[in-house]
Amino acid sequence: MKHFIKENKGLAIYSFLMVFATYGIKLFNNTYAIDTMHLMTNYRGYLKHWVSIGRPGLVALKLLTYNYVNVYFLNLLAIIFFAIATILLCYYVDLSTKQIYNKKYLYIIPSIFPTSQLFSEQFYFVLQNFEFSLGICLVILSLIAIYHIPNKIFKLFGFLLLAFTLTMYQSFFVFACTLILFKILMALYFAQLNDLKISFKDYAFKIGHFILLAISSLVLSQLMAMLAKKVLNVESSYLDNMILWGKRPLIDSINDIKDYAKELFFPQV
């Protein structure tokens, strides 16, 4: 990682500049939503609420700044760690390619990743923006440990870390799967590029490994969430308007996702 940053100082600086240009305004105002007010007035109660909806990992990170809600400080941490997450993503892509290529292509990542509209709503909430940024870092680090460090202890640590991140935000599961699939596709692409024969067994192994890693990490994260509820004696609950898979018609859930995605990507002006 140090070697990568040393060779790509311009990329690291550019990543910080893009994040600052996108969210730097948050360093100069103290606007926050009503959810943050609830946290200020009922800190313990809000942490228990997160445990009840299956987010004990988010609670664990929140304890890093326990009972301390400084809007400016949390926004600063969020921006710093989001920039670090962007650099880590560049590093992961660089490791996954394994080939000599024009390093300037890496500048595409900080140009579109931190500036994506997907994050604009999330970073409006001071309540969780620091933990969200740190969580992205942990997801990428876990996959680097699993796929790019030969030491088995690090691989095990990476697996446990990946499962832990899924107890922070369930949406990290989709993010992790996307990065894993990218790694697999790059491996297959460069094998074909070098005229290496890939058998059906090799394809099946890579896909099977992906499915096994995804399912096992998800199952372990759910066990962690259940254990946290049991230890803390907290009953399960759900967020308002949360999609309850299996308790509503599947078509209704799909339509909800389509409507939300349409509103997010194609908002009416």
Where are the regions that the model predicts?
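Start-transfer (signal-anchor) and selected internal transmembrane alpha helices
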Residues: 1-20
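Membrane-lumen/periplasm interface segments of multi-pass, membrane-embedded glycan/lipid transferases
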Residues: 25-73, 207, 211-269
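Membrane-embedded glycan transfer/ligation machinery
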Residues: 34-41, 50-90, 121, 131, ...
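Membrane-interface micro-motifs in multi-pass membrane enzymes
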Residues: 55, 104-147, 167-172, 176, ...
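Transmembrane-helix motifs of polytopic, lipid-linked glycan transferases
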Residues: 79-99, 141-145
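Membrane-interface transmembrane helices that cradle and orient dolichyl/undecaprenyl
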Residues: 139-154, 187-194
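Membrane-interface alpha helices of multi-pass inner-membrane proteins
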Residues: 154-176, 181
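Perimembrane helix-loop-helix junctions
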Residues: 176-218
